[in-house]
Amino acid sequence: MAIAHSPDVHAARRPLCGVLPIVHLPFDAADRIDEADLRHEVDWIFSVGADGLGTGMVSEIVRLSADERARLTERLVEFTAGRGSVFVSVGAESGSVARAHAVAAEQAGCDAVMAVPPMTVRLPANAVVDYFRGIAESVSLPLVVQDASGYVGQPILHAACVELLDRYGPEKILFKPEASPLGPNLSALRDATGGRATIFEGSGGILLVDAYRRGIAGTMPGVDLLDGVVALWRALSAGDEEATYAISLPISAIVALQMQAGLDGFLAIEKYLLVKRGLFRSARRREPVGWSLDDETAREVDRLFDRLAEAIATPCATRS
């Protein structure tokens, strides 16, 4: 049974749309979340034009304790201070834990929750549906159903997505499909739902141009290239093809380097760039990690980052 909530809380909720970065977590020398750097990151996110923010796999969410997750959610709502929508990842290895995370997110003032299926067991389709139904019915918030099988977990069948959408409607159930190949799978989900599904992409920017043309409602990149992704989204919205490809190419080249080492590759390069930008004091990641950035890759990232800065600075890229 869904929890009852006051109409005033529901009316204040902000919709998810546009550029919605997934925050990275700064850690101090004692491996604690550095809340001063986190606040700095959130302020920068909105200063460059993002529409909201959230947590996800690149937030190292599965490496946090339950208490850390709850405190992080509270801090993100506090630091955002009404400047945009806030959503958090609530996926867990059990339905009861996922539901508890979702309830905590609603109580903290989030606008939506997002969840992946359990990652340590391969579930039949009916169990996947039951898992998401449990989360959906535990809160009044919209639920983003995330298929992160391009890098972790199992794919979610389109039939399961259609069942959830039919049961709860498009305002309650949203989607972030990341199964490979992303573009064709995104279109297949769009078509299977008769165009009713609200769909977000999360490729880090490398597939944003293709996904945009297939009808997405927004993108959920990392924060490291956020100014570039905001400029790219604006260029796409304006139909500016020249700016679109000028910005997209260096973003795609950087993300291609990140993809070489899976989630650890993304985290290592993303945090390297956040330190380079002056947003984080440390590129520390929660251990254990399987890959670290080498000097030659870092130099190539630097070259591409300079090219991205040049592309963003051109007049065609900065028009909104």
Give short role names for the model-derived ranges.
Residues 71, 75-79, 104, 108, ...:
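Alpha-helical structural signal in soluble globular domains
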Residues 2-11, 20-24, 48, 216, ...:
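C-terminal alpha-helical cap/extension of soluble enzyme domains
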Residues 33, 40, 67, 71, ...:
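Conserved active-site and cofactor/substrate-binding residues in soluble primary-metabolism enzymes
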Residues 84-85, 143, 172-173, 197, ...:
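Secondary-structure boundary/capping signal
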Residues 2-156:
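Active-site beta->alpha loop and helix N-cap motifs at the rims of alpha/beta catalytic domains
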Residues 41, 72, 164, 244-247, ...:
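A structural signal for short hydrophobic/aromatic patches embedded in well-ordered alpha helices
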Residues 101, 107-108, 194-200, 298-308:
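A short, hydrophobic/aromatic-rich structural module that often spans a beta strand
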Residues 149-263:
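Catalytic alpha/beta core domains of metabolic enzymes, predominantly
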